A protein has these predicted regions:
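Donor-binding and catalytic core of enzymes assembling or modifying cell-surface/extracellular glycoconjugates
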Residues: 1-88
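A structural signal for well-ordered alpha-helical scaffolds and beta->alpha junctions
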Residues: 27-28, 88, 98, 130, ...
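Flexible, glycine-rich phosphate/dinucleotide-binding loops
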Residues: 28-29, 52, 92-93, 104, ...
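Short, functionally important structural connectors and interaction interfaces within domains
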Residues: 42, 87-90, 97, 120-124
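Glycine-rich loops and low-complexity Gly/Arg-rich segments
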Residues: 44-47, 70-71, 90-93, 108-112, ...
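Short, charged, surface-exposed secondary-structure boundary motifs
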Residues: 54-56, 94-95, 113-117
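Gly/Pro- and small hydrophobic-enriched strand-loop and loop-to-helix capping segments
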Residues: 79-107
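Leloir-type glycosyltransferase catalytic cores
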Residues: 100-154
């Protein structure tokens, strides 16, 4: 929620832009805070509402994609959409999005550090993303945006 609010604030890179939220039906609960944190006029909620081919067509129309290591992240990258891939401790150099229009943000904590924490729950992969900071993702997003914008005008 904080990342989207930062990036869509007045004067920021996605100010006045709409945000599309993609995911499967079983991801609705985890996505609701993000959806509820955006004004209805700025949110396109596609959680569980579209087939993979429809989602692919929607992603193709996006001007930017930020998401975890997933099939949708790879679809965005393959379509040429500027893509920020979010990674826990898995190796982004192996599984990250490819291309000049892509960048990965990786957890600052190793896999062994993350699984050794008291609150680690092996039934949830959410714990593996806790080492990602909003600041790091915002910085990477702004850098990629500036790089893409610069290459388009130059």
């Amino acid at each position: 929620i904080e990342l989207i609010q930062r990036l869509t604030r007045k004067g920021k890179i996605f100010s006045g832009k709409r945000v599309a939220i993609f995911g499967a039906t079983n991801e609705r609960d985890i996505a609701m805070p993000v959806i509820q944190g955006l004004p209805d006029t700025e949110c396109i909620n596609l959680i569980g509402k579209a087939s993979i081919s429809s989602v692919t067509a929607c992603i193709k129309r996006c001007s930017f994609f930020i998401g975890n290591d997933s099939g949708l992240m790879h679809i965005a990258a393959a379509l040429g959409v500027p893509t920020i891939g979010l990674f826990g401790p898995s190796p982004a150099q192996r599984y990250g999005p490819w291309g000049e229009h892509c960048q990965s943000v990786v957890s600052s904590e190793s896999y062994h550090t993350l699984i050794g924490k008291k609150d680690f729950d092996h039934r949830s992969s959410a714990n593996l993303m806790n080492g990602l900071s909003v600041d790091a993702v915002e910085k990477a997003t702004c850098e990629l945006f500036d790089r893409i914008k610069g290459s388009a005008s130059g």
